């Protein structure tokens, strides 16, 4: 019997449901219907291989059910030892690949039900878990991966880890089901003072940004903390609320939204303000209409002033006025840079975040070899790339030798700057929501676009490109200068006009078109940008389209420009 998500949560006995019975059922590779919802809170999604779905149906077989498992790794920082362990898990239990997400987590794909528990236990043995990596809770907390600000990054990471731990569910269900923790009778009701018995109305996302870098796309988060640094000292954070990417095609009641900056807090106020924001969404969010349940709609429905006042009431203090800040880009810069502490950091481009050994690349083997050097740490970036961080100068040569041996810098040397900085969600064949290809299509589209860029002398001009298989926007497409959002197999909405700083939403330019139509639409625009753009002042493609009057701000009810007085 199908229940609403709200009913499933409230009747789940703190996220237990019948998961243990579902896992023990050897007749099917699937979970019971309600448990498919609950397992998300444990960090996993039930999926199936859509490439062979029709064939299995013809053979009267159930779908090829499999599970995606996502880690909770705040800020995407792990040790070389942990990297090696995750590599081993991917090889033993998953599809021989690791995938870096846009929220600095890892995803394992292709895990079958009978090996799900063993995989969870192996992940936890690395001192990494998957609790609350999915579901209507706070998800993995993003942290700027800026390798230049060594001390500031350490502080941001520590603050993000504090917030992540503070917002974890209290339930012991995760530990009972996956780690065989015994339930102690009379041990209390596992009260959830932050989440309550129904958790949040919808997923909740938090990001920590460190200007001038906005790699986390902080304005796409439900709650953002923008570090205010003065003379190398972290004074505190500007707070932003109400960002979100998800929307539905053709539904005027849904839209992407950039967050509002509402004030400034000190570090010792972080947990209080995070709790106040999350509980405000818990109590004010729309639980009746799930597509309208994100915090951005809560703000739009009740009014920003009302929500800010409620946050201040719950926190017990009013936010201070926001401090000046400025972002200059939201992408990654590749190659070696020296941090302020004298250690070196190597950023490697990982196309769509996929780490695997293929006929053309040996990323999994190469990064395994680097991890075996046991130097520095591994940082996932919010752009699905990887930083080999904190490498002593004396170890650079050994790292460089392995990078060369395994061609790990092939992505850094892509033919166009656009290809080097592009992002895509997983989409087909595993995502059940995908309407079109994304990760598998990105290399082909980049290659098709490359001649146009080279023809107009734009091969080395950075243009933010993102591809999403559906309008839910996991690759944050609505902030890109150029984005493809899947509408149907081989057909996309072409979105144009975002910026390189993650501060402006793009606009629908052409709807439901094929690759030849996309290229035909882009050809005259790229030609104009090449000849009329203010390249001397580094004018971006999206900025040019607005200045030239090609693109206007999108028609969403809440779209606005950032408060100019905050941009120092």
Swiss-Prot record:
A Pfam family this chain is assigned to: NIR_SIR
Broadest EC class assigned to this enzyme: oxidoreductase
Classification via PROSITE patterns: NIR_SIR
InterPro entries reported in the protein's UniProt record: CysI (IPR011786), NiRdtase/SiRdtase_haem-b_fer (IPR005117), Nit/Sulf_reduc_fer-like_dom_sf (IPR036136), NO2/SO3_Rdtase_4Fe4S_dom (IPR006067), NO2/SO3_Rdtase_4Fe4S_prot (IPR045169), NO2/SO3_Rdtase_4Fe4S_sf (IPR045854), NO2/SO3_Rdtase_FeS/sirohaem_BS (IPR006066)
Reaction(s) catalysed (UniProt annotation): hydrogen sulfide + 3 NADP(+) + 3 H2O = sulfite + 3 NADPH + 4 H(+)
Cofactor note: Binds 1 siroheme per subunit.
Biological or metabolic pathway of the protein: Sulfur metabolism; hydrogen sulfide biosynthesis; hydrogen sulfide from sulfite (NADPH route): step 1/1
EC number(s) on file: 1.8.1.2
Binding positions for [4Fe-4S] cluster per the UniProt entry: 425, 431, 470, 474
GO cellular component terms, A-Z: sulfite reductase complex (NADPH)
GO molecular function: 4 iron, 4 sulfur cluster binding; heme binding; metal ion binding; NADP binding; sulfite reductase (ferredoxin) activity; sulfite reductase (NADPH) activity
UniProt KW keywords: 4Fe-4S, Amino-acid biosynthesis, Cysteine biosynthesis, Heme, Iron, Iron-sulfur, Metal-binding, NADP, Oxidoreductase
Cofactor(s) of this protein: siroheme; [4Fe-4S] cluster
GO biological process: cysteine biosynthetic process; hydrogen sulfide biosynthetic process; sulfate assimilation
Residues that coordinate or bind siroheme: 474
Quaternary assembly: Alpha(8)-beta(8). The alpha component is a flavoprotein, the beta component is a hemoprotein.
Family the UniProt entry places it in: Belongs to the nitrite and sulfite reductase 4Fe-4S domain family.
HAMAP family assigned: CysI (MF_01540)
Name this protein carries in UniProt: Sulfite reductase [NADPH] hemoprotein beta-component
Source organism per UniProt: Xanthomonas euvesicatoria pv. vesicatoria (strain 85-10)
């Amino acid at each position: 019997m199908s229940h609403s998500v709200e009913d499933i949560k409230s009747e789940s006995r703190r996220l237990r449901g019948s998961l243990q019975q579902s896992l023990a059922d050897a007749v099917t590779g699937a979970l019971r219907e309600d448990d498919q919802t609950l397992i998300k809170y444990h960090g996993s999604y039930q999926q199936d291989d859509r490439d062979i779905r029709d064939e299995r149906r013809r053979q009267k077989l159930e779908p090829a059910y499999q599970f995606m498992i996502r880690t909770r790794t705040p800020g995407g920082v792990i040790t070389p030892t942990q990297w090696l362990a995750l590599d081993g898990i991917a090889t033993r239990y998953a599809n021989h690949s690791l995938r870096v997400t846009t929220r600095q987590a890892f995803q394992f794909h292709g895990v079958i039900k009978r090996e799900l528990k063993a995989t969870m236990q192996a992940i936890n043995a690395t001192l990494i878990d998957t609790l609350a990596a999915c579901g209507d809770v706070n998800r993995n907390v993003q942290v700027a991966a800026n390798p230049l600000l060594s001390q500031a990054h350490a502080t941001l990471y520590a603050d993000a880890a504090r917030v992540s731990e503070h917002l974890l569910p209290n339930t012991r269900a995760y530990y009972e089901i996956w780690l065989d923790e015994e339930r102690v009778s009379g041990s209390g009701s596992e009260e959830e003072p932050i989440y309550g018995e129904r958790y949040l109305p919808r997923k909740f996302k938090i990001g920590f940004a460190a200007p001038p870098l906005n790699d986390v796309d902080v304005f796409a988060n439900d709650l953002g903390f923008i570090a205010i640094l003065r003379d190398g000292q972290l004074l505190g954070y500007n707070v932003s609320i109400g960002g979100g990417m998800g929307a539905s095609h053709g539904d005027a009641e849904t839209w992407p939204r950039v967050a509002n900056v509402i004030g400034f807090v000190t570090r010792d106020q972080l947990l209080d303000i995070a709790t106040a924001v999350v509980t405000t969404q818990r109590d004010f969010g729309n639980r009746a209409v799930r597509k309208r349940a994100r915090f951005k709609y809560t703000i739009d429905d009740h009014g920003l002033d009302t929500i800010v006042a409620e946050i201040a009431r719950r926190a017990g203090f009013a936010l201070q006025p926001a401090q000046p800040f400025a972002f200059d880009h939201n992408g990654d810069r590749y190659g070696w840079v020296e941090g302020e502490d004298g250690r070196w950091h190597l950023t490697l481009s990982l196309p769509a975040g996929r780490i695997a050994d293929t006929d053309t690349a040996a990323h999994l083997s190469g990064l395994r070899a680097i991890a075996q050097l046991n130097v520095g740490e591994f940082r996932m970036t919010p752009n699905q790339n990887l930083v080999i961080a904190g490498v002593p100068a004396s170890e650079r040569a050994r790292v460089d030798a392995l990078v060369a041996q395994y061609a790990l810098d092939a992505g850094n040397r892509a033919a166009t700057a656009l290809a080097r900085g592009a992002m895509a969600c997983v989409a087909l064949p595993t995502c059940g929501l995908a309407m079109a290809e994304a990760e598998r299509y990105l290399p082909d589209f980049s290659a098709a676009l490359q001649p146009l860029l080279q023809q107009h002398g734009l091969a080395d001009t950075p243009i933010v490109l993102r591809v999403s298989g559906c309008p839910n926007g996991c690759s944050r497409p609505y902030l890109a200068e150029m984005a493809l959002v899947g509408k149907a197999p081989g057909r996309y909405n072409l979105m144009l006009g975002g910026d390189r700083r993650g501060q402006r939403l793009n606009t629908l330019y052409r709807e439901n078109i094929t690759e030849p139509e996309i290229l035909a639409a882009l050809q005259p625009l790229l030609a104009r940008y090449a000849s009329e753009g203010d390249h001397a002042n580094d004018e971006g493609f999206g900025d040019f389209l607005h200045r030239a009057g090609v693109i206007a701000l999108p028609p969403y009810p809440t779209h606005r420009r950032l408060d100019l007085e905050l941009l120092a």
